[in-house]
Swiss-Prot record:
Coiled coil: none annotated. SUPFAM superfamilies: F1F0 ATP synthase subunit B, membrane domain. The keyword Cell membrane applies. The chain crosses the membrane at residues 7-29. It comes from Vibrio parahaemolyticus serotype O3:K6 (strain RIMD 2210633). NCBIfam families: ATP_synt_b, PRK05759.1-2, PRK05759.1-4. GO terms for cellular component: plasma membrane; proton-transporting ATP synthase complex. It is found in: Cell inner membrane. This is ATP synthase subunit b. Its main location: membrane. Belongs to the ATPase B chain family.
Amino acid sequence: MNINATLLGQAISFALFVWFCMKYVWPPLMQAIEERQKKIADGLQAAERAAKDLDLAQANASDQLKEAKRTATEIIEQANKRKSQIIDEAREEAQAERQKILAQAEAELEAERNRARDELRKQVATLAVAGAEKILERTIDKDAQKDILDNITAKL
């Protein structure tokens, strides 16, 4: 094999080229590749975190929805209980008012009945005195008449 200057020059040039590439070209390429690998790994981690966060958010939303439904059910139950309580109170108040009105009407009726009895007693006494006057054919003075009327009224 014949080694001449051209081959030696090519070998030196190739060695210089390899050294130059290793010194100046290779590090930026490796850095770019490493940065790209890091970005891809970070992107995959972010996607995994996002998927976990989505699952967690869906679970939280489901829990909140269940809690809201439970709260709504409780509020409806409380409203129904309050409604029943208000109806019962109104019914009791109406019953009490009814009893009050009936008692008042009964008292008024009794008072009217007593007044009518007293009036009838007075009329009967007046008629009795008038009849007695005619029978006796004399007039009784007012004081004596009043005493007689009161006496008769008390007896009736």
